[in-house]
Amino acid sequence: MTNKMIQGNSLHANNQSAKAKLMGAVRESIPKAFATTKWLLSIMIPVSFAVLLLNYTGVLAVISGYLAPVFELMGLPGESAFVLLTSIFTNIYTAIAVITSLELEGRVVTILAAMCLVSHGFIVETAVLKKTGSSAIRMLLVRLLGSFAIGVFLNWALPTDLIHAQTQVLVQNESFKVMFMDWAWSSILLSVKVVVLITLLMILQRILEVFGVIKLMSKILAPLQVVMGLPESTSFSWIVANTLGLAYGSAIMIEQVEKGQMAKSDADLLNHHVAVSHSQLEDPLLFAAIGAPLGWLIIPRFLLGVLVVWLCRLERGLKKGLNFNSKKSGD
């Protein structure tokens, strides 16, 4: 009887301890989630409004017209430039809306989808990558060159026995008032989504950290991290970026850097990977819904991310060698 009472008291104490840890995780996470949400929305809302103005005034269409010859070199219709440009300044959803307004065959849709998955939301996502330790200009170049590398590869690898359909961009005929109201409503929905997702994600991250799950996940993923050229400390942020994307995953990435759980040099390596390979669940599925095969949207981006990291490591090694030689010659 005494042993049962002792065991019962011990179990009760453990439950109380677990509850205290959970409540503590929630209390610690909410202020940080609010700060990250405020920072993210302060970028997203003004940028989306600026893009609304560029689209309404026809500036995006004019710029895409100048870029059309570059896309034709990859076997894509000239109007494809408008799709990628829209993706760069906005998001995947808008890019899909533009694609579905064009008469494109499956091969072209697949190439464009893969390029958009690498190059979208440049302003917001580059701000995230910069805040976690990378050069903004470098990240822009990595993503832009990466999207064209993917486009060239898929143009070479995909079957070429399909004929390009004639395409034509549908001109925006909506009044500014209608466009503004649509933008305002979508911005409200986006804000709610950002607040909810980031708050829940920050709470989850803190709970996993308190109960030691993150360390366990890091050990399990260690072999894959070695292949990818990424440090073990980046494993959880890598999972978050590949499931939720950079915008929603930014809270975790920033938190880990600020708390010293991930060195900025390690975060920079991670950023080189996730710059071209992130959000490997929802975004590819959205394009799959309009006919693009998932394999061609996921695997090439992952392999490109691995290649970019190893190239970055090679660059760092060469710089260290040059610095060592210069110091030696100076002595």
Residue ranges with predicted function:
Residues 42, 46, 59, 86, ...:
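Hydrophobic faces of alpha-helical transmembrane segments in multi-pass integral membrane proteins
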Residues 77-134, 228-287:
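Alpha-helical membrane segments and immediately flanking helix-loop junctions
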Residues 119-174, 282, 287-319:
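Transmembrane helix-loop-helix hairpins in multi-pass inner-membrane proteins
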Residues 93-115, 141-153, 173-174, 180, ...:
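Alpha-helical membrane-embedding segments
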Residues 86-100, 135-142, 163-171, 192-199, ...:
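Juxtamembrane/interfacial segments around transmembrane helices
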Residues 2-70, 144-153, 157-226, 303, ...:
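Selected transmembrane alpha-helices and immediately adjacent juxtamembrane segments
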Residues 50-60, 94-99, 154, 209, ...:
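Juxtamembrane "helix exit" motif at the C-terminal ends of alpha-helical transmembrane segments
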Residues 19, 23, 27, 31, ...:
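Juxtamembrane/transmembrane-helix boundary motifs in multi-pass membrane proteins
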